[in-house]
């Protein structure tokens, strides 16, 4: 009996030591609901004799990944001694309505990184993950970089869900509230829709990306700066090669306890990063395609100033209400119309891991097209594990 107890104690000790050296965590989010989306726009005929092209369609049904994208992932660390750790994160996005993989069918499309970290010098990662702007502005956006059309990425394309493949990223620890990050991608999108022409053997045959930023977080104050740049591949069309999309971002929030105020500004030139893109893709009678800018779009001469004002407030101990206004003033888009987005959201916590949500968003001059409108509303449930 004593030998059995001794053996059990030794095994428990070994298990504890192993656990202290290596840790692997399974985590995830399931977000599903019911929603309605209506898109209405008209394109004038190219000539006086041409009829206008009208588009007015709506859909009602299941929605998923609204508050946060549905996902599952593995996060691990190994203690290497002297405060140094090996780290990895594999995160797979999926559609909780039908079970399909997200992020163009990638197995770990949300994140696939391995690296080293230390409390003294920071963290170095290799692989696919979000850019610095997405990391730093998510906590400033009243919608937490979620809720589809309502989030900050609708008007400030580099600030939400922009992911780069083949990236080396370094982030410092937090020094008195300050943190700096920088990353470089050798090939930003290996699953480019035009992979034959845009992904090649030579380094310059691939779209490359730079992302960097600085933030300050101290108590109720949160301030962030960011910069992103795309370098065209040699195989792209001439107009695209001449373009070097850039995005500059500045934003901040302050929590007054009864209400939290958020402000943000972005300047985008020569293209659109479009981490989420627009939900409409239509081929016009002329053969031209309409649908706003997609992911990592190159457009020489394009310029846009974007603004966001947001508020959020707790109601009781379990509810939050939040809203924002975004405006994008573009140039050289073909339409050049100012886009305004008005959004309102609400969450109710059923527990620490499960909550209900509702939101509504209305966009005028949607995708920079005159009188184009997009309305999105939805209710759902989110569970974290």
UniProtKB/Swiss-Prot annotation:
Keyword Signal recorded: yes
Record GO biological process: monoatomic ion transmembrane transport
Membrane topology: Multi-pass membrane protein
GO molecular function term, any single one: porin activity
Leader peptide range in chain numbering: 1-20
Effect in UniProt of substituting residue 29 to T: In strain: 10901
Pfam families in the record: Porin_4 (PF13609)
Main localization (coarse): membrane
Keyword Hydrolase on entry: no
Single GO cellular component term: cell outer membrane
Cross-referenced Gene3D superfamilies: Porin
This protein's UniProt keywords: Cell outer membrane, Ion transport, Membrane, Porin, Signal, Transmembrane, Transmembrane beta strand, Transport
Location within or outside the cell: Cell outer membrane
Quaternary assembly: Homotrimer.
Family from the record: To bacterial outer membrane proteins and porins.
Record's function text: Forms anion selective channels.
Protein name: Outer membrane porin protein BP0840
């Amino acid at each position: 009996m004593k030998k059995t107890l001794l053996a059990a104690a030794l095994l428990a000790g070994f298990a504890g030591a192993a656990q202290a050296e290596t840790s692997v965590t399974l985590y995830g989010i399931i977000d599903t609901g019911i929603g309605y989306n209506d898109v209405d726009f008209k394109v004038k005929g190219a000539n006086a004799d041409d009829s206008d092209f009208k588009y007015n369609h709506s859909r009602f049904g299941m929605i998923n990944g609204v508050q946060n994208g549905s996902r599952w992932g593995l996060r691990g660390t190994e203690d290497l001694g002297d405060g140094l750790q090996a780290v990895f994160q594999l995160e797979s996005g999926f559609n909780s309505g039908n079970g399909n993989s997200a992020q163009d069918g990638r197995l770990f499309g949300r994140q696939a990184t391995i690296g080293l970290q230390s409390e003294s010098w920071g963290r170095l990662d290799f692989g696919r993950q979000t850019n610095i702007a997405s990391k730093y502005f998510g906590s400033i956006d009243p919608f937490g970089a979620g809720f589809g059309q309502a989030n900050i990425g609708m008007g400030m394309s580099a600030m939400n869900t922009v992911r780069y493949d083949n990236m080396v990223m370094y982030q410092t620890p937090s020094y008195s509230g300050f943190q700096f990050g920088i990353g470089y991608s050798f090939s930003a999108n290996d699953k480019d829709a035009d992979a034959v022409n845009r992904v090649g053997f030579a380094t310059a045959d691939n779209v490359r990306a730079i992302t960097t930023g600085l933030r300050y977080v101290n108590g109720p104050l949160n301030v962030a700066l960011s910069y992103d740049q795309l370098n065209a591949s040699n195989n792209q069309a001439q107009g695209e090669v001449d373009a070097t999309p850039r995005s500059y971002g500045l934003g901040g929030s302050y929590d007054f306890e009864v209400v939290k105020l958020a402000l943000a500004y972005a300047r985008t030139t020569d293209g659109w990063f479009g981490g989420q893109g627009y939900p409409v893709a239509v081929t016009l009678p002329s053969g031209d395609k309409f649908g706003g800018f997609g992911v990592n779009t190159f457009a020489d001469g394009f310029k846009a100033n974007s603004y966001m004002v947001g508020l959020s407030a707790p109601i009781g101990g379990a509810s939050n209400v939040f809203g924002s206004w975004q405006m994008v003033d573009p140039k050289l888009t073909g339409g050049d119309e100012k886009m305004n987005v008005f959004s309102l959201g609400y969450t109710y916590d059923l527990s620490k891991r499960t909550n209900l949500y509702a939101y509504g968003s209305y966009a005028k001059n949607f995708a920079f097209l005159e009188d184009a409108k997009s309305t999105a509303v939805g209710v759902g449930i989110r569970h974290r594990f």
